[in-house]
Amino acid sequence: MRLKLAATDRRPDLLKNSYRATLDLFEFIHAGILTTVQDLGRFGYQRYGVPVSGAMDLFSFEVANTLAGNDKNLASLEMTLAGPTLRVINPCRIAITGADMNPTLNGEKVDLWASQSLKTGDVLAFSSAEHGCRAYLAVSGGIHAPEVLGSRSTYLRGVFGGYRGRPIRKGDVLQGTLSDAKTRIRYVPPEYIPSYPTNLTIRVVLGPQEDFFTDSGVKTFLNSTYEISPASDRMGYRLDGPRIEHSKETEIVSDGVAVGAIQVPGDRMPIILMRDAQTTGGYPKIAHVVSSDVNRLAQLRPGDNIRFEQIDIRRAHELIYQIMNHLSSLKKEIGERHPVPEFPDGETLMRFQGAIR
């Protein structure tokens, strides 16, 4: 077993000491369609043109970390449409949430939305998602990756963050951090587990450039069904459906954009900006997806259908508070996380099950 010391991110709330122990966790036999290392995102750099990035479905991501006994922002794996197959190098504890990719451990089905212990030599395999688009794999202690601009998230177009700035490939080896997270099984009560329908109504707040569209165009937007295009990715969801009529120019002086902004370019087909979206844009924005619905949107896949429902700012704020309270209640049901220990001395190190052989 390889045991290394890695400089910490210097966050005193996570670790008071200057170093943490890392060890090899997984070797990838198959990589999956798009498997990346993500955390909650990269904040404070949009003014420099750097997107927020981070997990597409923040709810599933954060719950996975809670199940694994982690701080909510520790790096985890995001798997899209079809997951990887990996061999366990050192014992660890994991949790899987999000889309059901039929995970198996040595050929036996693994429960979703629950923690699971893995031992050396185990093979954890994922297949194609039956429902939803993205699944999350958290490991106790977090996945080790260099911090770039305050985050370990992978920004694919920028080729930085995560594992060498790229998706996981066959043969890659991921490292993790030694953790003393309790070994009891954690699970999410059934009433908290989200469903992933293929037809979804997404709530939006109109603006800021709704005056660039005719009344007929706005009605078309709010009363039509749109299909997620295969040309969708972490940067944006392109939609196929009825065209939206402009009343003015199809371009504006570039201004700032946020995750969830819905642009309508010259072809009159809407584009929903997602986590890896650019930070400015020159197309008029007819509406914004409310923050609480971006997670639901992230679980839609090409061919799924969406409709838009207009709400006001007050209602959008209420929905944010609702999802925050929902997540807080869920964490209490699961149990409070346990703090990451200081770097252990020799005797303490021996207490980590399976860490020293």
Ranges and model annotations:
Residues 2-5, 14-357:
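Conserved "landmark" site that anchors the functional core of diverse proteins
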